[in-house]
């Protein structure tokens, strides 16, 4: 009888822990699946739609005061990866961004700021791995932060924002989409 009670308690606790797990989902991208033409850059020899993906998250840790989003290619032949998108100062009560949110200020929550991607623009810059290269592992990450505001502007580089995110992160969750051309 004691074993049954213990087992029941463990099952109940595991489902509570599962319910509180920080998760990221998307209708546009999937873990382990290549990005679609919608998330491919239009330039640098690529001919995609350059549309930021829909992202939704839940289960952020207690104490989360804001969120940030990054899209990063650690496999880019730059010596330091490639920042495709950074969004900071997303209020803690926001839990999703729609497809194409980066395309206009109205697509982002009030107060959110998009930093400069490595194409030199503020906003989303889609995937564009070199032709014939190995798959690049595009990391779409939502960061739960212990601060409500990062003091950056739209000219902030991905490297600066990445540094500030790591210094202020409570947790992060990501979808990795290996993509080649």
What are these regions (language model features)?
Residues 1-6:
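Bacterial N-terminal signal peptides that target proteins for export
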């Amino acid at each position: 009888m004691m074993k049954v009670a213990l087992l029941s308690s463990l099952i109940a606790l595991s489902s509570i822990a599962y319910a509180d797990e920080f998760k990221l989902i998307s209708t546009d991208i999937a873990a382990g699946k290549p990005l679609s033409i919608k998330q491919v850059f239009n330039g640098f020899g690529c001919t995609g739609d350059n549309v930021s993906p829909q992202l939704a998250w839940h289960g952020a840790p207690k104490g989360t005061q804001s969120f940030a989003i990054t899209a990063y290619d650690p496999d880019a032949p730059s010596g330091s990866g490639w920042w495709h998108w950074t969004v900071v100062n997303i209020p803690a009560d926001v839990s999703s961004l729609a497809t194409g949110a980066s395309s206009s200020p109205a697509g982002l929550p009030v107060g959110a700021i998009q930093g400069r991607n490595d194409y030199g623009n503020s906003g989303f810059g889609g995937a564009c791995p070199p032709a014939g290269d190995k798959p690049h592992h595009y990391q779409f990450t939502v960061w739960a932060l212990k601060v409500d505001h990062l003091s950056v502007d739209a000219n902030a580089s991905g490297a600066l924002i990445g540094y500030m995110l790591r210094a202020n992160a409570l947790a992060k969750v990501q979808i990795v989409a290996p993509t080649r051309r």
